[in-house]
Design a protein with these regions (language model features):
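Exposed beta-sheet edge and beta->alpha loop/turn motif
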Residues: 92-170
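Intrinsic-disorder-associated interaction segments
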Residues: 22, 26, 59, 63-66, ...
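Sec-dependent signal peptide recognition
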Residues: 1-7
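Generic surface-pattern signal
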Residues: 38-42, 71, 75-79, 154, ...
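Short, low-complexity N-terminal intrinsically disordered segments enriched in polar/charged residues
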Residues: 4, 15-42
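Short solvent-exposed beta->alpha transition segments
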Residues: 30-31, 46-103
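Hydrophobic alpha-helical core bundles mediating ligand binding, dimerization, or RNAP-core interactions
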Residues: 33, 40, 52, 142-143
């Protein structure tokens, strides 16, 4: 009986530690997404590139080409007078594993102002923690599909349903 009590206490401790870790992971990926989005709208190209997954960087032609693409996007955002008015996380991140990686699907709800108009955007960022890595990197969610996620990240859980996304004028 004593060993059963000890086992239950140990299991409760492990479950509690996992819940704390999960909460810390959720806070971390949300803060990383906040940093990434702020960096984009503030023109911080280095931070945007640092938070972009290496597979995406490679598909863009390498770091120099990726930097140029981000710089061009920043110019378009500034020319359109686009600003993030608000950024919230409507649901907690979902964590998945596959192909030796950890993934975080981080839902976002933002209000963007542009040339006197406001746009509401429900979207998500796909976070990736590669084996041996300590920092999460991301892929913008509206560009991720069940088909291309397997090309980008073989082993991603094939049955996962990505959250919906939309953009609408307010």
């Amino acid at each position: 009986m004593t060993w059963l009590c000890s086992l239950l206490v140990a299991l409760a401790f492990v479950a509690s530690a996992e819940a704390v870790q999960s909460g810390q992971d959720a806070s971390r990926v949300q803060e990383d997404v906040r940093t990434l989005i702020r960096a984009l709208y503030n023109g911080d190209v280095d931070t945007v590139v640092r938070y972009t997954h290496p597979t995406v960087i490679a598909m863009q032609g390498g770091t120099s080409a990726a930097r140029k693409l981000v710089q061009d996007l920043v110019v378009k955002l500034k020319d359109g007078d686009m600003r993030v008015e608000s950024l919230t996380f409507p649901k907690p991140p979902e964590f998945l594993e596959g192909g030796g990686r950890r993934f975080a699907v981080v839902p976002t709800l933002s209000i963007i102002s542009a040339n006197g108009q406001q746009i509401e955007s429900l979207n998500f960022q796909l976070g990736i923690l590669d084996p041996g890595a300590t920092d999460w990197t991301f892929v913008e969610g509206s560009r991720v599909t069940k088909q291309n996620v397997q090309v980008l990240f073989p082993g991603f859980p094939a049955t996962y349903e990505f959250p919906p996304f939309y953009r609408k004028r307010l």
